[in-house]
Design a protein with these regions (language model features):
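Catalytic cores and adjacent flexible loops of soluble metabolic enzymes
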Residues: 1-186
Length: 186
């Protein structure tokens, strides 16, 4: 339905995504071009295979996790276990969901001795000094709306301050509003 309204095509979302998917060769070409121009390459994995490709094959130095995967504990755990810094998009998440995601990341970065991955272990990792230190060193929260394009009235820039105060982490904005007006707000 989205494609029909906004793109004007009858193809399914799966067909569209398969058509737009970059090959491994295209990734290598893009990352080489970025390195030649001293541009930091960044990519978002949406599954464990893509995460492995980015970390093991392309050897990226940072990951971005999309809002839709904020509750994908296996992906979050594997991403943090890579040791790479992570930009975590928060989309429509409640603070409790962000805290749960941060618990998974804290566990992946600094697993408490002998703990198996589970909700209780994630909470302990989030509350631990080692987990907090890892989060502060490695994680940036990204405030964003999930509407494309987003009306200025929906930008809710105060959410960034709330996240910064709640989690004491670096916070940024993924701006989906048209133009640059939101960037000029104080």
């Amino acid at each position: 339905a989205y494609q029909q309204r906004h793109v004007g095509t009858q193809e399914t979302q799966l067909t569209m995504l398969q058509r737009l998917q970059l090959s491994a060769a295209a990734h290598y070409k893009i990352i080489d071009r970025c390195r030649d121009r001293q541009i930091r390459f960044l990519s978002t994995p949406f599954d464990l295979g893509s995460l492995e490709f980015l970390t093991n094959d392309l050897r990226v130095d940072m990951l971005k996790i999309g809002s839709g995967d904020l509750t994908n504990a296996p992906l979050l755990l594997a991403a943090a276990s890579s040791g790479l810094p992570i930009i975590l998009s928060t989309g429509m998440a409640a603070l409790a969901e962000i805290e749960q995601a941060l618990g998974v990341l804290a566990f992946g970065y600094a697993p408490p001795s002998g703990d198996r991955p589970c909700h209780a272990s994630f909470k302990r990792a989030f509350a631990s000094a080692a987990g907090n230190a890892a989060l502060k060193a490695k994680v940036t929260l990204l405030h964003c709306t999930t509407e494309y394009p987003a009306p200025e009235a929906e930008a809710n820039l105060r959410a960034m301050e709330t996240m910064r105060q709640t989690f004491s982490l670096a916070v940024g904005l993924s701006d989906h509003t048209p133009g640059i007006a939101v960037a000029d707000r104080k």
